[in-house]
């Protein structure tokens, strides 16, 4: 995969100092924000002047709890135990990953992202959600699969988020424990698991058959743009 064309991240609400300088050096022209309206309001991106933002709310049509609502549950030990206990947290995220494939707002968001990357006028580009692991993780995973990266390498790349976010969520887990909660309840929400990506892949194969068919029929990306996307992102042998 060519370097310097597509980037992923968590939200950019704390971008400043050396990080802002490093970001500017990447020459990123467009940021695609996959978050909900309440997430964007809670922590707006801080971007260099001249960087365009495109909002692609993946979960706009979801009837499940929003990410901000889930975080609010962390403050109530009883509600957290009810929602996340007995495998509830993992089951909730598996539902969300299934929504990434079938939800109309998700397909619209990912279609617009893929179409823009295929066109190339927006690049270098970056896409992100709040933690950069779920909505962003699925986008990165199916992009890599579409480009022909082997399944095991895609899974390994997806699971890197678990290591990189471990320190980020440590204060949240410690605070939950200090209030008397069991931090293990929150682990399914603050990390990534193979079963999450496998759930999305299973739904994709069930509904569309192949990655290429998902991009063509689920996202509505036609032959020309699909060819353009591969040509732009695959490094020549």
Predicted feature residues:
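Ser/Thr-glycine-rich phosphate-binding loops at phosphate-binding pockets of nucleotides
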Residues: 131, 135-136
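Cys-dependent protein tyrosine phosphatase-like superfamily
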Residues: 1-126, 138-237
């Amino acid at each position: 995969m060519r370097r310097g064309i597509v980037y992923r991240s968590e939200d950019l609400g704390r971008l400043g100092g050396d990080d802002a300088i490093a970001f500017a050096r990447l020459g990123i022209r467009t940021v695609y924000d996959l978050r909900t309206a309440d997430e964007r309001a809670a922590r707006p991106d801080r971007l260099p002047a001249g960087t365009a933002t495109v909002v692609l709310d993946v979960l706009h049509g979801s009837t499940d709890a929003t990410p901000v609502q889930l975080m609010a549950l962390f403050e109530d030990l009883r509600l957290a135990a009810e929602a996340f206990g007995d495998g509830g947290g993992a089951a909730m995220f598996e539902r969300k990953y299934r929504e990434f494939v079938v939800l109309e707002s998700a397909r619209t968001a990912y279609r617009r992202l893929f179409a823009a990357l295929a066109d190339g006028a927006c690049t270098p580009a970056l896409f992100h959600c709040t933690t950069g692991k779920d909505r962003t993780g699925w986008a990165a995973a199916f992009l890599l699969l579409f480009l022909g990266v082997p399944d095991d390498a895609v899974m390994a790349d997806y699971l890197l988020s678990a290591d990189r976010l471990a320190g980020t969520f440590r204060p949240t887990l410690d605070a939950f424990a200090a209030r008397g909660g069991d931090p293990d309840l929150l682990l399914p929400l603050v990390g990534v698991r193979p079963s999450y990506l496998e759930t999305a892949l299973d739904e994709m194969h069930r509904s569309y058959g192949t990655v290429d068919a998902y991009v063509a029929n689920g996202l509505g990306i036609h032959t020309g743009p699909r060819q353009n996307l591969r040509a732009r992102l695959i490094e020549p042998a």
